Design a protein with these regions (language model features):
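Structured mid-to-C-terminal alpha-helical surface segments
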Residues: 1-32, 39-47, 58, 75-266
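Catalytic metal-binding acidic patch
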Residues: 52, 59-81
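Gly/Ser/Thr-rich helix-start
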Residues: 52-53, 186
Length: 266
């Protein structure tokens, strides 16, 4: 198991100035280990890396992410359990003390496994409390929309590997869909990161949200914003951003959408 201070060369010095970031740096290292391990298994053929951690590790967004999310096609629950059991055994071989604590949830449509690391923060000198919780949630869910994945290079903490990911426009559509359905602060932030780079895949959005053009998307986003306290939303992911001042951009989301250049989606 690596010493936390050995990760310093892989991260910008300013990130180490904030002690609160250290546990997320450690988590990112473990996320990279898990992804790298999965590339050695047959399960990687049935999953696509999505979500906020994709944005962090593939696209380079300036915030940490907490979970590993995958779109899965033709992956059974028993295969998911076998996949995550393999992850647990791999982490143990790497020197981590790990355990799973899962409660049945009939409302959950995804496969989910919570991997806990008892006393890891305490033993790493990142917390004065033995019982402080540290976990990585792994979630697989079929997005119910067909698209062609592509291979992306992922590198960090001395690791270098390829992993299946969605195209940028599909990833953008996934984030827009998530924003419209749950309105988490980090979703606003992520959409503001993605939309200037690529328009969303409207085939995906049409199947997920019934939106098939930029005009209707802009209308839906502005209608959604009218019921949301953006200042409040900007606070719910403050602990994840590299620079706490960056969360203020979420309060400008309405103006951002109003000025969004729709021709980028043509």
């Amino acid at each position: 198991m690596i010493r936390t201070e050995n990760l310093k060369p892989y991260f910008a010095p300013f990130l180490w100035e904030n002690q609160a970031h250290h546990k997320y740096i450690l988590k990112e290292y473990i996320q990279l280990l898990i992804l790298d391990y999965l590339t050695t298994t047959d399960f990687v053929k049935k999953i696509v890396f999505i979500g906020g951690t994709n944005l962090r590790l593939v696209k380079g967004i300036d915030r940490f992410s907490e979970d590993l999310d995958f779109d899965c096609k033709n992956l059974s629950n028993s295969e998911f359990l076998a996949m995550t059991d393999g992850i647990v055994e791999f982490l143990k071989r790497m020197g981590f003390e790990v355990e799973t604590r899962d409660k049945p949830n009939d409302k959950l449509k995804a496969y989910r496994r919570n991997i806990y690391f008892p006393e890891l923060l305490f033993k790493s000198g990142l917390s004065g409390y033995k019982q402080e919780r540290f976990l990585i949630k792994i979630e697989n869910q079929d997005q119910q929309t067909a698209y062609t994945s592509q291979m992306a290079t992922i590198k960090g903490c001395g690791l270098f590997f390829m992993f299946p990911v969605p195209a940028d426009d599909v990833l953008c559509a996934m984030k827009v869909s998530a924003l419209l359905s749950r309105q988490k602060g980090r979703d606003f932030y992520d959409v503001m990161f993605l939309l200037p780079q690529t328009g969303p895949d409207f085939n995906f959005l049409e199947q997920q949200c019934g939106i098939n053009n930029a005009f209707d998307l802009k209308k839906a986003l502005l209608e959604m914003i009218s019921t949301v306290d953006l200042k409040h939303k900007s606070k719910d992911f403050e602990h994840l951003v590299f620079n706490p001042l960056s969360i203020k951009r979420v309060t400008l989301f309405k103006k951002f959408i109003e000025e969004w250049e729709m021709e980028r989606t043509d």
